[in-house]
Structure formats: structure tokens, C-alpha cells
């Protein structure tokens, strides 16, 4: 950094008057008055030194200390300097370097300068090697010691301009090495490539939607991306926002449907779409895959037709709603409304839970007896869209159980709120209004919803009594009651049903006693008299009459009986069973 010294130095520059005028405009606040471009500035021995401008962070020099020398003095003063050729050459180089440094500091390198002569003493000092740290620019007016901050021959202090080597290098060459680093305002474009169109677009794909929707459908896991499951139709992009496609938790199945948001209890999903098949075609064995097959019944419980959703191009996304393996994971039940199949949420389904459907809690309808659910409210809203929550009160009245299931079907009343929230819907088919006569009764302001009997085809398709087949694991049973016990872990009130007729019993012993009435032959014969009996228990009781064995003994009176029923009747009689008492001992009196 250049620092001003004491006045009276011997080194000065002859500067053009235009340069001085511009200098005065840059520093108008100086305390020494205006700069003057010509005229004598005092005697030759005491010229005013030229002080280059400091950088903005340093103290500004006083303008009145800058006094240019006249032209006559320049030529006269240059006479002593012409004594040595080498010194003149060195002084020219040093003066050029000092002028370039001053111009770089003031930012005035474009201003014209007439000539830059310096005195010989300055050249002598500048020709010396630069010090390692500080550079001293100046001269002495006479012989004497020449060092920074020293004194000349006249005893006065010699002005020195001090700057470090780093500062000089910065002001001379620093701006040439400066590089402007532009701000990286470029942001990478999002990946808008549509994998289905195989095309890069500026925005989202107009046909297949944004990329996040595709990720929501096919999943983002590496396993799913490495080996995607087959059978991905194009219409899967039409999934409603309430659900999304997922990997099914049921073993052996690729896809499933899970809840994308919380689904309230009572939400209706449907209708189920598929191909209508006549019962004769299904019973003939033309349909091999019955996994997506539903039955439609009329008001009398007669099978009308089947809805087959096995073909993806003619069905909807509801075909991927799988059947529950047990009652614990079931969250949807099947409801038939007129000639359509709907799924209804029987519990609140959390987000991320797979939708699994199964039959309602009355499995009697599963075996050929359709239930009639009578809605007590005329304002029953049946959705026509894919999914609509109806916000109903789930107050279900108990069944009106009949003693004989073969004579009259059970009835179940579903109570809906008087002011259902949401929107009102009218169920319309593509071909027009649905038939209004189906599932309606004569009672005013009541509507009948027949629950579907998905495997009541066991009544017709598997007419033979030993071919009862499970719709989940395809396991066959010899009796329908065995299939019923296999399907439902919570048995109804009468789970034991006769394989020869439609009667059912609550205890297995009652069923065994009833089965004997269907058989005319008596396979159990007595070995003593040859009499035949229908049951083994009856034969054993008869044999005791020949042997005289009485294994049943009363603990009170110690009487024995042949059958347990005889002992029970004996204990119930008040006067027949008397405890045995010992006679009192006789007392001898002397």
C-alpha cells in the first residue's frame, strides 16, 4: 500500500493538466484547495511529492500535497540523471511500474499521461533488488544512508512509499487472475418420461397421467420393479382415488387392492362387472375358473344367471379384490342389490390394508338359502359410482330364527339412519333402468336386498351328495355339514345337518338318532336271539338282558340296573330310592 511521506521529497511526476482536473473531481473533499496544473511549486529542493490515490478502505490523501512540477524543472532536473546510461534505463522501468500501480488504484488507466520522468536518485533505489516483504519506493536528496524511514544528507526525513509484495501483486495482476463464478440457477428437469408411451415430454403424459400415479399403481419396490407381476391391463389407471393396486397377501396371487385412504364402515363398492352366463353353461362345466364368478338370484331364490369377471378386458378392477381366507381378515361383505353385486365395508378399513371379501355372518345363505334384508328406510342410497361412503348407522337387528330352516328362510332387518348423509343416487344400468320388480315386497316404503349365495351352486351344480366342494381351497367333502364346518369356524345354532334331508340339529347325538330313520336295514344283530337293531347302543342294552349284567348301581340304595336310563328314572322317584339303615342293637339289662 502506498503511504504518503513528509513533504519535500525529491521524487515527483509530471502529469498532464487534464489528469489533475479529473483527480480534483474524484476527491473534491480535500482540505488543501483546488489542484493547479502549472506554475512553480516552490524551490527545486522542496518539491511537493506526488501521492497516488489509496484504495477505498485506506485513509484518503490530502489533495493540496499533490503539486506537479513545471516543465522547465523537468528538463533541468534531468541533467544529473544523464550521467549514467544504466541508471536512466532502470529509472524508466521503475517509473512505469509506479505509474501503473497508481493508475490501477485510482481506476484511471485510460487517462492520457504526457511523460513520466523521474529523478536519478529514485532510479538508483528502484534498481536495487526488492525486499522480500515490504517494497520501499522513494529517494534521498543527497548522499547518505538509504533505507526505509532513514534520513538524507540534510538531516530531514526522506519520504517512503511502502507496500507489501502481495499488495503490489494484487493491484498489478490480481484482476487478470479473477474468475467470475456464475450462480448455478439451472435446475434439473423432472423425469417426465412416460414408460407406457416410451416418450419424453415437457409435462405429464396426457394419456397416462403423471409419473407418481404410475408408481402408485405398479409399486416402487425393487422386487416389484425387477419382476413385475403379469396381467396389467390398461384400464387399471382408472382406479378411484380411495384404492390402489398392491401385491396381494394371499399366497399364489399376484395383484390385490388396498385402501389408499381410510374407508369407513358401510362404504359400498361396485357394481361388479363381468360377462353374464346362463346357469346351464356353468353347470355343464364350460367355466373352469370360478374364482371371479358370482350368482344372481331372483325374489324367490331361484338362480337367474352368473356374472363372470374372469376376463380382464370385460370386467373391472373389482376382480382383484381377493377372498378372505378366514373370518379374521375379512373387511368386505357381499351384497346383491337387484341384479348387481356390491361389496360393503363391514369394518373401518385403515390405509394400506388389503381389501378382502367374504360372505356375511349368516353362512346359511352360503348353502342355498338367500336371506332377505329389509331396509326400513325408503331413502336408502344405493351408489352408482365406483365407490361412495354412505355414512350409515351399523345397528343390525338379530335374526328371526325359525325352528325349521327348510320351511321358511331367515330374515334379517338392517336399520339405516333416517337422514343419511352424502348424496342421493339412482342405480341405472347402461341399457336403462334396472327391473323394478325384483326384490320388492308389497309392504310400503320397504325394499328387499337379497344377499348373494355365491356357492349355492352346490345345490345344482354338485347335485351328488358326496361332491361338496370348497370355493377357496377346492377341497371336497362327503356331506354339506362338513363343508359348512370347514368354511366357518363359528357354527350357527344348528350346524349338524342331515345328509339325506334338510333338517339340522344342535347336537351330534340328535343327528345320529335321526339318521337311523332314513335307513330300513338293521345292521346290528343280537348273538343270543338274532334280533336286529339299528344302533350299537340299542344292541348292547339288549345283550344285557341275556347276560343279566347290571353295571349301573345306585349309591344310595345299592340297587343295580341294566341301562343308564333305568338308573336315572329310579333316582328321580321319591319313594322308590330309600337308603339302607342298620337296625339298632339290643341292650341287655341284668
Curated annotation (Swiss-Prot):
- The record's EC number reads 2.1.1.361
Q: Does the keyword Transcription feature in the UniProt annotation? A: yes
Which InterPro entries does this entry report, sorted A to Z?
PRDM6_PR-SET (IPR044416), SET_dom (IPR001214), SET_dom_sf (IPR046341), Zinc_finger (IPR050331), Znf_C2H2_sf (IPR036236), Znf_C2H2_type (IPR013087)
Does DNA repair show up as a keyword for this record?
Answer: no
What is the catalytic activity of this protein?
Answer: L-lysyl(20)-[histone H4] + S-adenosyl-L-methionine = N(6)-methyl-L-lysyl(20)-[histone H4] + S-adenosyl-L-homocysteine + H(+)
Cellular location(s):
Nucleus
* Residue numbers spanned by region Disordered: 25-87
Q: Which UniProt keywords apply?
A: Chromatin regulator, Metal-binding, Methyltransferase, Nucleus, Repeat, Repressor, S-adenosyl-L-methionine, Transcription, Transcription regulation, Transferase, Zinc, Zinc-finger
Primary location group? nucleus
Q: Which GO terms describe its biological process?
A: methylation; negative regulation of smooth muscle cell differentiation; negative regulation of transcription by RNA polymerase II; neurogenesis; regulation of gene expression
Q: Where is the SET domain?
A: 241-360
GO molecular function annotation: histone H4K20 monomethyltransferase activity; identical protein binding; zinc ion binding
Show the ranges annotated as biased composition (Gly residues).
Answer: 29-42
Recorded GO cellular component terms are: nucleus
Indicate, by first and last residue, each region the UniProt record lists as having compositional bias (Low complexity).
Answer: 71-87
- Zinc finger (C2H2-type) positions are 468-490, 496-518, 524-546, 552-574
Q: Which domain of life is it from?
A: Eukaryota
List the PANTHER family: HISTONE-LYSINE N-METHYLTRANSFERASE PRDM6-RELATED, PR DOMAIN ZINC FINGER PROTEIN
Function, please?
Putative histone methyltransferase that acts as a transcriptional repressor of smooth muscle gene expression. Promotes the transition from differentiated to proliferative smooth muscle by suppressing differentiation and maintaining the proliferative potential of vascular smooth muscle cells. Also plays a role in endothelial cells by inhibiting endothelial cell proliferation, survival and differentiation. It is unclear whether it has histone methyltransferase activity in vivo.
Q: Which family does it belong to?
A: Belongs to the class V-like SAM-binding methyltransferase superfamily.
Quaternary structure annotation from Swiss-Prot or TrEMBL: Interacts with HDAC1, HDAC2, HDAC3, CBX1 and EP300.
Record-given protein name: Putative histone-lysine N-methyltransferase PRDM6
The source organism is: Bos taurus
Amino acid at each position: 500500500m502506498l503511504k504518503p511521506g513528509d513533504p519535500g521529497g525529491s521524487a515527483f511526476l509530471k502529469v498532464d493538466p487534464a489528469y489533475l482536473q479529473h483527480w480534483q473531481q474524484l476527491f473534491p473533499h480535500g482540505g488543501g484547495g483546488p489542484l493547479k496544473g502549472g506554475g512553480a511549486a516552490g524551490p527545486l529542493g522542496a518539491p511537493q511529492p506526488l501521492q497516488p490515490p489509496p484504495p477505498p478502505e485506506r485513509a484518503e490523501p490530502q489533495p493540496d500535497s499533490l503539486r506537479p512540477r513545471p516543465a522547465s524543472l523537468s528538463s533541468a532536473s534531468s541533467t544529473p540523471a544523464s550521467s549514467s546510461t544504466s541508471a536512466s534505463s532502470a529509472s524508466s522501468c521503475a517509473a512505469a511500474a509506479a505509474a501503473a500501480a497508481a493508475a490501477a488504484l485510482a481506476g484511471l488507466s485510460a487517462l492520457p499521461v504526457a511523460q513520466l520522468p523521474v529523478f536519478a536518485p529514485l532510479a538508483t533505489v528502484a534498481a536495487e533488488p526488492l525486499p522480500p516483504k515490504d517494497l520501499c519506493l522513494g529517494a534521498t536528496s543527497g548522499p547518505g544512508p538509504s533505507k526505509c524511514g532513514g534520513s538524507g544528507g540534510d538531516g530531514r526525513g526522506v519520504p517512503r512509499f511502502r507496500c507489501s509484495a502481495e499488495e503490489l501483486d494484487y493491484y498489478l495482476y490480481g484482476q487478470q487472475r479473477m474468475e467470475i463464478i456464475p450462480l448455478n440457477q439451472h435446475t434439473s428437469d423432472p423425469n417426465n418420461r412416460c414408460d407406457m408411451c416410451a416418450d419424453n415430454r415437457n409435462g405429464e403424459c396426457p394419456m397416462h397421467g403423471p409419473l407418481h400415479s404410475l408408481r402408485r399403481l405398479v409399486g416402487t419396490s425393487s422386487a416389484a420393479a425387477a419382476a413385475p407381476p403379469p396381467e396389467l391391463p390398461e384400464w387399471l389407471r382408472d382406479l378411484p382415488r380411495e384404492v390402489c393396486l398392491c401385491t396381494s397377501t394371499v399366497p399364489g396371487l399376484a395383484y390385490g387392492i388396498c385402501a389408499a385412504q381410510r374407508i369407513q364402515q358401510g362404504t359400498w363398492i361396485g357394481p361388479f362387472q363381468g360377462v353374464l352366463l346362463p346357469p346351464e353353461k356353468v353347470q355343464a362345466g364350460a367355466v373352469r375358473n370360478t374364482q371371479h364368478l358370482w350368482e344372481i338370484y331372483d325374489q324367490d331364490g331361484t338362480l337367474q344367471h352368473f356374472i363372470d369377471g374372469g376376463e380382464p378386458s370385460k370386467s373391472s378392477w373389482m376382480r382383484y379384490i381377493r377372498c378372505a381366507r378366514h373370518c379374521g381378515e375379512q373387511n368386505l361383505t357381499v351384497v346383491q342389490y337387484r341384479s348387481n353385486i356390491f361389496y360393503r365395508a363391514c369394518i373401518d378399513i385403515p390405509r394400506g390394508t388389503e381389501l378382502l371379501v367374504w360372505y356375511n355372518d349368516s353362512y346359511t345363505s352360503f348353502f342355498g338359502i338367500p336371506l332377505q334384508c329389509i331396509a326400513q328406510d325408503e331413502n336408502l342410497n344405493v351408489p352408482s359410482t365406483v365407490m361412495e361412503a354412505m355414512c350409515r348407522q351399523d345397528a343390525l337387528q338379530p335374526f328371526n330364527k325359525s325352528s325349521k330352516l327348510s320351511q321358511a328362510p331367515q330374515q334379517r332387518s338392517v336399520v339405516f339412519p333416517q337422514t343419511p348423509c352424502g348424496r342421493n343416487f339412482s342405480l341405472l344400468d347402461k341399457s336403462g333402468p334396472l327391473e323394478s320388480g325384483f326384490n320388492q315386497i308389497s309392504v310400503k316404503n320397504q325394499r328387499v336386498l337379497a344377499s348373494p349365495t355365491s356357492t349355492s351352486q352346490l345345490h345344482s351344480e354338485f347335485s351328488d351328495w358326496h361332491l361338496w366342494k370348497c370355493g377357496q381351497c377346492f377341497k371336497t367333502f362327503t356331506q354339506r355339514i362338513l363343508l359348512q364346518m370347514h368354511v366357518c369356524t363359528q357354527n350357527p345354532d344348528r350346524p349338524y345337518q342331515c345328509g339325506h334331508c334338510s333338517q339340522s340339529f344342535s347336537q351330534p347325538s340328535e343327528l345320529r338318532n335321526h339318521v337311523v330313520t332314513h335307513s330300513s336295514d338293521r345292521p346290528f344283530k343280537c348273538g343270543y336271539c338274532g334280533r336286529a337293531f339299528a344302533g350299537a347302543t340299542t344292541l348292547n342294552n339288549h345283550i344285557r338282558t341275556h347276560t343279566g349284567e347290571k353295571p349301573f348301581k345306585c349309591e344310595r340304595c345299592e340297587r343295580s340296573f341294566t341301562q343308564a336310563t333305568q338308573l336315572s328314572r329310579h333316582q328321580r322317584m321319591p319313594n322308590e330310592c330309600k337308603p339302607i339303615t342298620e337296625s339298632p342293637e339290643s341292650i341287655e339289662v341284668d
